[in-house]
């Protein structure tokens, strides 16, 4: 309502009052008094209205101030600069400013906006803190609600992006720790599963005892410190068990292989445990086959060892005889004579049957002796090969001597050309004998110098055999020279007799011839003259080995 309208209304009311007063007959004094009362009442109404408006103004200003303070607090909590844009006082003074109500509406809108942003920021904080709480709970294995709630209440005055970023970094660190724990859990579970497979254990039962969630391959698994410790402890325990069983199995298999070798167990009987025997030199990481270290397998191997143990005693006599025969065969091939320390077969059997000795000890002695003989045979190999060649050459030499003494050797007959070829080869070989003997003697001398004991051939010193052969060969050579000289002398005597027979009577010539023939009739090649070497020359058809046999 405008001012003119108010004045018009006030005038009409006064006129109406004047009319009534006239009709009533009120005096001027009463009229003045009533007008004063009306004016006083109007003043009071105006004053009340003014006070009320002032109070409203104060309230609006206070609300504006409170809202501004709230906005400033929210900006402070969120670490943002307060942007209010309040200029109503200066604007009002200049007469063109916004009213307090307009300012209140504006600040309330700003407050609503900031409250909304704070609420959104708070939701972000709650989400991050809740994620942190969940990860901590998984890691610690216990509820962490109280800690998280108290942390949030203490930090509610700080909802800044900086604080939110710190929480995000903390969450990332915890999530990284969680990922590492999950990987560690998975690795340990795979290791435990492999150990259970090798040891023949029930994997589900084993892992359930640690934590039931570890059985579930799709759901969430426990990654708490307690679960990690229990899982690592279980892996360590079964790994040590694997090592113990592996060592036990390898010891059992070693004994089983010894039994197999000892008793020459057929391959078909060994086939059942062939996979087990393959692990005799395996490392812990190389044993991965299921049930390869199970209790059942160990018991099976132990049962087989018990069977072999029982079988061993029944076959021990046979084994001793066999090993002894093998030793004798090795000695025969290497021309080594068994020493007195080697127990005779008859005595060995009697000792085993009486129980006075352990058959295994006897076998060990025989195998040890066989090993020593084989070791010595390696060092004797070259000399033995040369000795065999020498003995073969000696046999050819004897055959050639027999052949040369055969008066019918040049008679043509079946196979005579083959005999002539052999004689040719024998002469070539015999011509090499001196060099062969010298080389062999040199080898033997070096060998005896290195070993510091004599080289024996079937119990005889081989060097002595060579020396004896050399002496005999020289004696035979001297005998052959003596025969040639004697034959030459005999030819000269015969020639002189033939010259004198022209003047002597026929009877005298005949008597001399008979006498001469009687003198050498004992042998077509060997004269009857007593010679210091005649006894040895009769041995010319024997070999060095036969002389020392």
From Swiss-Prot:
The protein, known as: 65-kDa microtubule-associated protein 9
Record flagged with keyword Cytoplasm: yes
Alphabetical UniProt keywords: Coiled coil, Cytoplasm, Cytoskeleton, Microtubule, Nucleus, Phosphoprotein
Source organism of the structure: Arabidopsis thaliana
Predominant subcellular localization, coarse grouping: nucleus
Entry keyword annotation includes Zinc: no
Lineage: Eukaryota, Viridiplantae, Streptophyta, Embryophyta, Tracheophyta
Compartments, as annotated in UniProt: Nucleus; Cytoplasm; Cytoplasm, Cytoskeleton, Spindle pole
GO-annotated biological processes: microtubule cytoskeleton organization
Bias-annotated ranges (Polar residues): 514-549
């Amino acid at each position: 309502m405008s001012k003119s309208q108010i004045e018009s209304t006030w005038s009409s009311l006064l006129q109406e009052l004047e009319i009534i007063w006239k009709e009533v007959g009120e005096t001027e004094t009463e009229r003045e008094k009533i007008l004063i009362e009306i004016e006083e009442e109007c003043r009071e109404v105006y004053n009340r209205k003014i006070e009320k408006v002032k109070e409203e103004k104060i309230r609006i200003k206070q609300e504006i101030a409170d809202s501004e303070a709230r906005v400033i607090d929210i900006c402070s909590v969120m670490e943002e600069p307060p942007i209010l844009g309040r200029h109503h006082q200066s604007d009002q003074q200049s007469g063109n400013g916004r009213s307090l109500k307009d300012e209140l509406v504006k600040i309330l809108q700003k407050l609503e906006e900031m409250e909304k942003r704070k609420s959104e920021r708070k939701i972000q904080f709650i989400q991050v803190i809740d994620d942190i709480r969940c990860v901590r709970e998984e890691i610690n294995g216990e509820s962490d609600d109280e800690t998280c709630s108290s942390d949030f209440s203490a930090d509610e005055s700080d909802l800044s992006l900086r604080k939110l970023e710190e929480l995000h970094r903390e969450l990332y660190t915890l999530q990284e720790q969680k990922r590492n724990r999950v990987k560690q859990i998975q690795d340990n579970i795979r290791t435990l599963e492999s150990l259970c497979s090798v040891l023949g254990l029930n994997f589900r039962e084993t892992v359930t005892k640690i934590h039931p969630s570890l059985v579930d391959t799709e759901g969430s698994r426990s990654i708490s410190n307690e679960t990690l410790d229990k899982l690592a402890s279980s892996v360590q325990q079964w790994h040590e068990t694997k090592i113990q069983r592996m060592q036990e199995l390898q010891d059992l298999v070693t004994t089983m292989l010894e039994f197999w070798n000892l008793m020459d167990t057929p391959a078909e009987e060994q086939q059942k445990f062939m996979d087990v025997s393959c692990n005799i030199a395996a490392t812990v990481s190389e044993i991965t086959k299921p049930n390869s270290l199970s209790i059942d397998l160990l018991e099976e191997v132990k049962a087989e060892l018990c069977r072999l143990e029982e079988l061993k005693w029944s076959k021990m006599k046979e084994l001793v005889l066999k090993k002894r025969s093998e030793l004798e065969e090795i000695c025969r091939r290497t021309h080594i004579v068994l020493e007195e320390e080697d127990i005779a077969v008859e005595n060995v059997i009697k000792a085993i049957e009486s129980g006075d000795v352990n058959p295994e000890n006897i076998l060990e002695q025989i195998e040890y002796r066989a090993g020593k003989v084989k070791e010595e045979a390696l060092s004797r190999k070259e000399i033995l090969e040369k000795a065999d060649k020498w003995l073969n050459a000696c046999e050819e030499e004897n055959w050639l001597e027999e052949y040369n003494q055969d008066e019918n050797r040049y008679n043509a007959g079946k196979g005579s050309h083959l005999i002539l070829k052999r004689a040719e080869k024998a002469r070539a070989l015999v011509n090499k004998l001196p060099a062969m003997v010298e080389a062999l003697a040199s080898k033997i001398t070096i060998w005896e110098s290195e070993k510091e004991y004599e080289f024996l051939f079937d119990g005889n010193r081989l060097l002595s055999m060579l020396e004896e052969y050399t002496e005999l060969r020289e004696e035979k050579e001297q005998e052959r020279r003596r025969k040639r000289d004697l034959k030459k002398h005999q030819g000269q005597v015969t020639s002189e007799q033939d010259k004198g027979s022209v003047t002597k009577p026929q009877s005298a010539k005949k008597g001399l011839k008979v006498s001469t023939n009687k003198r050498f009739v004992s042998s077509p090649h060997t004269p009857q003259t007593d010679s210091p070497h005649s006894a040895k020359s009769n041995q010319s058809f024997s070999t060095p080995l036969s002389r020392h046999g």
